[in-house]
């Protein structure tokens, strides 16, 4: 009898662990991307970092091209890393992670997952803006940036041609999320006062 109770308890624990693992939110960012976000502590750094991750997904899907400014920035960063690599001795302790300027690491994601990554980036931006606003921080610039980003990327999303139902659903979710973010941002911009300070 005691053994049966033990087995039943173990089965219940195993089932609850399996359910919690199944119900866990899927992550559409890589560990390196999460580190990049973690390093961008304040809102003015974090919002552009999320936009960058969303743009990478749109570029990888062929919906967007890198701007000349992005290409030049990546070239300078690559040259800077090359100089630093020559100066430092590369040991396991000092080894740096691979740079995130190349989008080839996104090969591991399906098109539907890339679209979900775009959605996750928008959700994170809106959550970060809401959090900053609740702490009485200035969010006007970030709201304006979000409005511009969604306005620029929504037409690109609508050009995506899904190949199956999973991609079709992910596309619809991405378009819906972008439209909702645009509507929410428009409403927030009518409430949040304009600031006089100039952008850096």
Predicted segment positions?
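Long, charged/polar, soluble alpha-helical segments
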Residues: 23-200
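Positively charged n-region of N-terminal signal peptides that target proteins for export
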Residues: 1-7
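Short, low-complexity interaction segments enriched in Ser/Thr/Pro/Gly
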Residues: 3, 22-23
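Bacterial N-terminal signal peptides
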Residues: 8-18
């Amino acid at each position: 009898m005691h053994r049966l109770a033990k087995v039943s308890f173990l089965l219940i624990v195993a089932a609850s662990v399996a359910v919690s693992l199944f119900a866990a939110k899927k992550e559409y960012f890589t560990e390196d991307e999460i580190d990049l976000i973690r390093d961008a502590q304040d809102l003015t750094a974090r919002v552009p970092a999320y936009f960058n991750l969303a743009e990478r997904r749109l570029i990888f899907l062929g919906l967007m091209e890198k701007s000349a400014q992005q290409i030049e920035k990546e070239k300078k960063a690559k040259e800077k890393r090359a100089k630093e690599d020559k100066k430092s001795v590369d040991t396991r302790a000092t080894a740096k992670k691979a740079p995130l300027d190349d989008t080839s690491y996104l090969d591991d994601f399906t098109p539907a997952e890339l679209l979900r990554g775009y959605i996750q980036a928008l959700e994170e931006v809106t959550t970060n803006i809401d959090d900053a606003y609740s702490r009485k921080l200035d969010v006007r610039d970030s709201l304006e940036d979000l409005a511009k980003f969604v306005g620029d990327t929504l037409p690109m999303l609508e050009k995506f041609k899904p190949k199956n139902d999973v991609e079709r659903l992910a596309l619809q979710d991405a378009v819906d999320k972008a439209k909702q973010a645009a509507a929410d941002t428009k409403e927030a911009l009518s409430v949040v006062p304009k600031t006089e300070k100039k952008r850096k």
